[in-house]
Amino acid sequence: MITLTQKDLLKAGVHLGHLSRKWNPSMAPFIFMESRGIHIIDLNKTLSQLQEAADTLQAVARSGKKILFVATKKQAKELVAQTAKSLNMPYMTERWLGGTLTNFITIRRLIKKLTSMERMMKSATYKNMAKKEQLMIARDKDKLERVLGGVLDLTKLPGALVVVDIMKESIAVQEARKLGIPIIALADTNVDPDLVDYPIPSNDDATPAIELIVRTLGEAINEGLSMRQEDKAAEAQDKDAQDTEDNKGARPRGAEKVAYSDADSEEDNAYGIAVKASKNKTAEPVERFKKSRTPVKGSRPIGVSKAGDKPKK
């Protein structure tokens, strides 16, 4: 649950929209009034939309999926990068590479190339190269790192996208829409809020306004991550309890179950005669015979094959 008030939003300038002549009619439900040629955003709508977006991001973080932050405008890139780093989430703040989402396999190849270049620059082979070759490799590595440095740990498509400016990040929005990835974005009075899933009516140009909204969304994500840790701890505890319960009813290894026939008398069972249980729950006693000292009539002594033959030596 967010704790922001209208006063907090007013102080940050969230309510200030664009010139009324530059408005997008789709933003009409979120506009409170027009003052001196400027549209004023309805902060009640901002709070309700912000709460919905925060709940969504909290659920995504709790599920274990990554949330990609996108902000390439000058006044937003630094604070967005810091927020994403603090949450261990991916971000793109320099330039959106076309196909980052729709051609994710190619982006992964570039990330692997960057990782390989970083390893090579630490090896003896790099040190033995000519200065010109070293400079070329370092320049290519820096270029890739500037663009892809924030998504090195993104091994699969993100669970959600957080966008600061819908118009400036239009390519990222299009790719996410094509793949069905939920989009949370600040929506100023000059944009189409229908392009994203969770528009937050807000000034997307003033740094204090951007910082306030992004920080609030970051807090929701952090809560989701904490819930995920609690869920894991509870699952581990339940598993240990179940294992303990299963071990209580288990027989020691090597122990055999001994059954007694219902047909046997109590006297027979008292002697400890073991029985084999059959499928129909009846049992036959297994008697233990001792060697007889008196030869059985008609039997041959051990070693004699036939009557009259001599015993074998």
Curated annotation (Swiss-Prot):
Q: Which Pfam families match?
A: Ribosomal_S2 (PF00318)
Q: Which GO terms describe its biological process?
A: translation
Provide the GO MF annotations for this entry.
structural constituent of ribosome
Disulphide bridges, residue numbers: none
Superkingdom of origin: Bacteria
Q: Which UniProt keywords apply?
A: Ribonucleoprotein, Ribosomal protein
- InterPro entries, per the entry: Ribosomal_uS2, Ribosomal_uS2_bac/mit/plastid, Ribosomal_uS2_CS, Ribosomal_uS2_flav_dom_sf
Query: What CDD domains does the database record attribute to this sequence?
Result: RPS2
Identify one Gene Ontology CC term for this UniProt entry.
Answer: cytosolic small ribosomal subunit
Stretches with biased composition (Basic and acidic residues): 228-256
Region listing for Disordered, in residue ranges:
228-313
- Has UniProt tagged this entry with the keyword Coiled coil? no
- Which family does the record assign? Belongs to the universal ribosomal protein uS2 family.
Q: Which HAMAP family match?
A: Ribosomal_uS2_B (MF_00291_B)
What name goes with this protein? Small ribosomal subunit protein uS2
- Its source organism is Amoebophilus asiaticus (strain 5a2)
